[in-house]
Amino acid sequence: MKTGFIGLGSMGLPMAQRLQAQGHDLTLYARRPESLEPFAGTSVAIAATPAEMGALVDAVGICVFDAAGVEEVMFGPDGLAGTLNPGAVVLVHSTVAPAQIRKIAGRAATHGLRVLDAPVSGGQPRALTGELTIMIGGDADTLADVTELLSALSNHVVHLGAVGAGSYAKLVNNTMFSAQIALADDAMKAGESLGVDPAGLAAVLATSSSACVASGVRLRAHSLAGLADSPANLTLTKDVTLMAEILGDAPGSGLVEVAQRFVAAMRSS
């Protein structure tokens, strides 16, 4: 399957590198030429525009920041939709609101294109080793057509339902991740109030029953302020804000309230 990939940021780059390392027939597009430098001297083809890519591939992964970016590469001037062959599969790895991905999928369908929302989790190291979790929303037959492609990136592909279901799951995951960072910060503050040695408490929390990936992020940073420069903060802030808008005061909204403490700390840093 000839594959395209757009979006070579912190997650998109290692995903594209994994596809290339696994021998996929790969075409890339990036707005910034420097993003393509890791592929210099390889067999990877470079497209000048998304439209040029669309004429060359059977499936394309999109890993840009938000829904506006997805719409731009799909339907903007020189977009994919005008040149992809009917039946081509578009995998949207970006985390967007479920209503937005359903709108994008509906518009793509008028061009004969099939869309799966396919947000990912696992971080850069797992992207490079093909061990991401990929959350799928969309048609089961469409998923079957790209199973081999996804297996290069993931050892845990979860089909959650119709288009939008994958995005719901990713928003829940990222909101929980943010909340866990905030709770780890609360735990360290509680220890400080009780006079517990901070380094010792951090060592306990990192190796005991409360340990998790998110708490480890906070403990290694020594404070929430120490996370302010992380590029992940923009994504987490976006996703927690989306989750708050979607969930409102429905059951589970307490999770959002805790996560918003992390968001508020990042905005004030």
Which residues fall in each region the model found?
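Rossmann-fold dinucleotide-binding core
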Residues: T3, V73, T95-V172
